[in-house]
Amino acid sequence: MLIDETAGSGGDMLPWMFDKLEMGTLVGRRTWGGLVGVLGFPTLMDGGSVTAPNVAIWTEEGFIVENAGVPPHVEVEQMPADVIAGRDPQLEKAIEIALEQLKENPPHEHKKPDFPIRARQPKK
């Protein structure tokens, strides 16, 4: 999974869950670390509103991700010069890793099951 410092909120939570469940390799840069939320906010007399975070993510290890982000397994920085040159080092590294993993763990071939006949059959 590609991650970087511009990812926050769901962009923090999804990589955290991906890592927690050991689903694959995180490639890129540490995520932003913004994973608190706001539920319900009062409307002021002038029609404006005020918000304050009142939802956070906790696990058995305690408070997670907020202000820390999710670190990648393989850190790859993407510089403006790379983008200008038409390169994406993070994507290139992720593809390289995925191809290596496919060699080590080739996908299983799956046989499509026969579909059951559910239509009424003529009597013989």
Please describe what each predicted stretch is:
Residues 1-124:
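C-terminal "post-core" interaction segments
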